[in-house]
């Protein structure tokens, strides 16, 4: 069991970065015994919202735009990929158009947290956005698959930075108590981009060329760059020279981390699609990567890492550990639902990809207000545990309802079930990061947010691999029983069911064969949704690990917005 009092007292050095004793001694203590100057109930209720000028709102719009764009480009290739491969070729390399982006975005997130602490928030954010725009231009102009993959990797490196820094900047300029409201806006835009990517890709491919799925980022990204340059003006320590700053980067730790995570991601990308899960080509990179992650954590806690990318004290209290676990499972469930509701729409209802994109709007249109409600409640109550319990419970109900869907389900059923699920999952969106940061000092904001972003992204990777394996395995079991044609059974067996769960494939079959195939897909999806309940249940259990920590209502950070220079008397 984690030690609460001793670990929290030694977690930070109170002499550094102006950390107040209150934030150290009260870390992760029960509310009833928190050693604050006010009672917890007073802290929760007597908080007046800070007044914010137009510069704050301009900054919020700027970082929201950057987050929306990078999230949109993260999923936009899922629908456009067949057209891209048809034009550029590339054979088996096509998978790296998706995986290259995913690998770069996931593996680089902790490093961006450290860069934000060393160089401030402004230039890493501008650099990441510029890299993303450059990568988009390379992708749009690619004449072969190798160039496209290189552009996607650049996009991923840029997206990694914008994701981490968007959340970090909000934490810098908004007190902990109010953060969930504004995180609901920013992260809601990120979620919106993630969900709408395939829909926009379908429209673009249908009415134009796939290249505009990438060229679209140029004017939008350019506008985001101009806005960020104009409005992202936050404080940071400028006294240290460049050579000293570069020398403080945890080069060895970051290299070890990137290598370990890449190994895990390679294993997951091959599992169930290129090789069977039991293949040594899958198991070896998975085991090597997991061992590498363990070695990375040992290194980060050693004397060889004086300025670690992921300080171990981030995991030194049960609240932060509980929130990290919840974040991992929330990442799994989020992508699980976004990827497998379209399988139902296309593989069971027979919808086209573009119509499927419209049908899943029920999730999007419900999750955004749900995030707003979660953020409002957290700010109003100054509590997160009741929200987490309620959110996971409703998420479990929604996932369970999905298992009832079949080819005869009404529109009201699949719309209503999405709304129920989204109300639960949506309230978690803005309330996990503030809960993670509650027991930590403000000096840990960037590293904490970066680690949290990585855990969420890492969960999303598993959220595609696990349900695909469940779906394919169940289809292999059902096909001999439900499909009459041996040739048709061979089409979907051996891990190929997921890739065939499309309206295009169903359209090539006779009516009788199509009904048999829909039955296989429907029953396989039912199993997939039932398995998802286990992961959401573990998220609910993790909520019991966290403790309620009083949420600070004042900022104590070195990276807040720069004060406006007063006008001279002659100008007044």
Swiss-Prot record:
**GO CC annotations, alphabetized:** plasma membrane
Glyco sites are at: 23, 317
Q: Which GO terms describe its molecular function?
A: transmembrane transporter activity
The places in or outside the cell where this protein is found are:
Membrane
* Membrane-topology descriptor: Multi-pass membrane protein
List the InterPro entries.
MFS (IPR011701), MFS_dom (IPR020846), MFS_trans_sf (IPR036259)
Basic and acidic residues bias locations: 1-15
Question: What broad class describes the main subcellular location of this protein?
Answer: membrane
Which superkingdom heads the taxonomic lineage of this protein's source? Eukaryota
Compositional bias annotation for Low complexity = 29-39
- Where is the stretch described as Disordered? 1-46
Question: PROSITE patterns attached here?
Answer: MFS
Q: Where are the transmembrane segments?
A: 56-76, 88-108, 123-143, 156-176, 185-205, 212-232, 255-275, 282-302, 321-341, 358-378, 386-406, 419-439, 451-471, 529-549
Keyword entries, A-Z: Glycoprotein, Membrane, Transmembrane, Transmembrane helix, Transport, Virulence
**Function noted in UniProt:** MFS-type transporter; part of the gene cluster that mediates the biosynthesis of pyrrocidines, fungal natural products containing a macrocyclic para-cyclophane connected to a decahydrofluorene ring system that show potent antibiotic activities toward Gram-negative bacteria.
The record, for PANTHER family, names: MAJOR FACILITATOR SUPERFAMILY (PTHR23501), MAJOR FACILITATOR SUPERFAMILY (MFS) PROFILE DOMAIN-CONTAINING PROTEIN (PTHR23501:SF187)
Q: In which family does this protein belong, per the annotation? A: Belongs to the major facilitator superfamily.
What is the name of the protein in this document? MFS-type transporter pydD
């Amino acid at each position: 069991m984690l030690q609460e009092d001793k670990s929290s007292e030694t977690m930070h050095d109170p002499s550094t970065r102006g950390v107040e004793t209150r934030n150290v001694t009260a870390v992760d203590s029960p509310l009833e015994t928190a050693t604050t100057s006010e009672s917890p109930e007073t802290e929760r209720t007597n908080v007046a919202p800070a007044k914010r000028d137009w510069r704050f709102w301009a900054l919020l719009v700027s970082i929201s735009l950057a987050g929306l764009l990078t999230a949109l480009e993260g999923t936009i290739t899922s629908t456009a990929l067949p057209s891209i491969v048809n034009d550029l070729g590339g054979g088996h390399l096509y998978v790296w158009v998706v995986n290259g982006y995913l690998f770069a975005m996931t593996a680089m997130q902790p490093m961006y947290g450290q860069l934000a602490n060393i160089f401030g928030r402004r230039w890493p954010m501008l650099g990441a956005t510029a890299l993303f725009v450059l990568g988009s231009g390379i992708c749009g102009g690619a004449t072969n698959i190798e160039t496209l993959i290189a552009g996607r990797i650049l996009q991923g490196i840029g997206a990694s930075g914008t994701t981490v820094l968007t959340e970090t900047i909000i934490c810098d300029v908004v007190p902990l108590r109010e953060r969930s409201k504004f995180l609901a806006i920013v992260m809601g835009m990120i979620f919106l981009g993630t969900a709408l990517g395939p829909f926009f890709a379908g429209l673009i491919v249908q009415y134009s060329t796939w290249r505009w799925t990438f060229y679209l980022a140029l004017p939008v990204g350019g506008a985001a760059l101009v806005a960020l340059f104009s409005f992202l003006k936050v404080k940071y320590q400028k006294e240290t020279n460049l050579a000293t700053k570069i020398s403080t980067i945890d080069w060895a730790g970051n290299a070890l981390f990137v290598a370990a995570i890449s190994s895990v991601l390679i294993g997951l990308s091959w599992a169930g699609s290129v090789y069977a899960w039991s293949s040594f080509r899958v198991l070896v990179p998975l085991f090597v990567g997991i061992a590498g992650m363990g070695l990375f954590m040992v290194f980060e806690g050693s004397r060889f890492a004086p300025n670690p990318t992921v300080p171990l004290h981030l995991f030194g209290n049960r609240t932060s550990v509980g929130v990290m676990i919840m974040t991992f499972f929330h990442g799994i469930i989020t992508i699980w639902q976004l990827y497998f509701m379209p399988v139902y729409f296309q593989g069971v209802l027979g919808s086209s990809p573009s119509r499927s994109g419209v049908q899943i709007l029920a999730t999007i249109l419900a999750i955004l207000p749900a995030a707003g409600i979660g953020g409002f409640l957290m700010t109003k109550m100054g509590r997160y545990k009741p929200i987490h319990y309620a959110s996971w419970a409703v998420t479990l109900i929604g996932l369970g309802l999905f298992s009832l869907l079949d080819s005869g389900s009404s529109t009201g059923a699949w719309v209503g079930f999405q709304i129920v699920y989204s109300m639960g999952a949506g309230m978690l969106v803005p309330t996990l990061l503030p809960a993670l940061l509650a027991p930590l000092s403000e000096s840990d904001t960037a590293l904490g947010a970066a680690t949290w972003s990585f855990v969420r992204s890492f969960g999303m990777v598993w959220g595609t691999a696990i349900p695909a394996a469940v779906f394919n395995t169940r289809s292999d079991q059902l096909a001999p029983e439900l499909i009459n044609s041996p040739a048709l059974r061979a089409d979907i067996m051996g891990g190929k069911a997921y890739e065939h769960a499309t309206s295009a494939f169903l359209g090539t079959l006779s009516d009788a064969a199509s009904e048999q195939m829909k039955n296989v897909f429907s029953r396989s999806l039912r199993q997939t949704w039932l398995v998802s309940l286990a992961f959401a249940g573990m998220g609910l259990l993790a909520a019991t690990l966290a403790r309620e920590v009083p949420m600070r209502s004042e900022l104590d950070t070195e990276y807040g917005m720069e004060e406006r220079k007063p006008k001279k008397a002659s100008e007044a």
